[in-house]
Curated annotation (Swiss-Prot):
The keyword Hydrolase applies. The gene is catD. GO terms for molecular function: 3-oxoadipate enol-lactonase activity. It holds the Pfam family Abhydrolase_1. Pathway: Aromatic compound metabolism; beta-ketoadipate pathway; 3-oxoadipate from 5-oxo-4,5-dihydro-2-furylacetate: step 1/1. SUPFAM superfamilies: alpha/beta-Hydrolases (SSF53474). One of its GO terms (biological process) is beta-ketoadipate pathway. NCBIfam families: protocat_pcaD. Gene3D superfamilies: alpha/beta hydrolase. Keywords: Aromatic hydrocarbons catabolism, Hydrolase. This is 3-oxoadipate enol-lactonase 2. It comes from the Bacteria.
Length: 267
């Protein structure tokens, strides 16, 4: 992973957010938001690619990585206002936001409620409503009772295609290990946020440009979910990558090129 330009912790609201920045602060800002059960290290291929061109910010979502784990359950508006607090802390009036899965749902909420803070939003492998509330509540209960090991043991098949699992075992093992070592309470509390989060009725309020990235083989948030977003967001485009759920890791070059195209267009 590239050497940190700066690493710190922001204490805001009820949470201490771990974050890192890369590149020169006077360049256009690009902030990345991780998926459920991962941390900011999932963006290392994006950091390496973009840090010489943009001011890159990565952070650990509350309850993940080195960020603190406030008492849950969490709500999607908390995940969103954590981002606004971080931008305020860094004195960044406007940025491009890129989030994957849970981070993509956070991005949709931000585009609805804080459009003035973003040039555009990139949402990858996500949906306006991810899964069913009952399933998320059941997963939260399972994790609180048994920890993250059972979830981590099966995560790879939800995250990646069989070919990637076979060809890149070190990457798969690293992400699975990070999940197993994470905070069970933080994971469960974010499951509860996902159980309640549903921005479908508000998508038509989004007026800023949105790039939707979907994985052709994603079993969690499907291409149809991405198409639904584009049908309801006025200034949106869909990019489908040959990947499963964690497309930025499985197809980093294609992912980076898709992000760079909108960065060049709207910055």
């Amino acid at each position: 992973m590239p050497v940190f330009h700066f690493k710190d912790t922001l204490t805001a609201q009820d949470v201490a957010l771990n974050y890192a920045t890369f590149g020169q602060a006077d360049r256009p800002a690009l902030i990345f938001s991780n998926s459920l059960g991962t941390n900011l290290s999932m963006w290392q291929q994006q950091i390496a690619y973009f840090q010489d061109k943009y001011f890159v910010i990565c952070y650990d979502t509350r309850g993940h990585g080195a960020s603190s784990t406030p008492v849950g359950p969490y709500r999607i508006d908390q995940l969103g206002t954590d981002v606004i607090a971080l931008l305020d802390h860094l004195q960044i009036p406007q940025a491009t936001f890129c989030g994957i899965s849970m981070g993509g749902l956070t991005g949709q909420w931000l585009a609805i409620h804080f459009p003035e803070r973003f040039n555009q939003v990139i949402v990858a492998n996500t949906a306006a409503k991810i899964g069913e509330a009952q399933a998320w509540q059941a997963r939260a209960q399972l994790v609180r009772e048994q920890g993250l090991t059972p979830i981590a043991q099966t995560a790879a098949t939800r995250w990646f295609t069989p070919g990637f699992i076979e060809d890149s075992p070190e990457i798969v093992e690293k992400l699975s290990h990070d999940l197993a070592q994470g905070s069970a309470e933080g994971y469960a509390s974010c499951c509860e946020a996902l159980a309640e989060a549903d921005v479908r009725p508000q998508l038509q309020r989004i007026s800023i440009p949105v790039l939707v990235i979907a994985g052709a083989q994603d079993p969690v948030t499907t291409v149809a979910d991405g198409q639904f977003l584009c049908e309801h967001i006025v200034h949106s485009t869909l990019e489908v990558l040959e990947a499963s759920h964690i497309s930025n890791v499985e197809q980093p070059q294609a992912f980076n090129h898709a992000v760079e195209a909108v960065m060049k267009r709207f910055n």
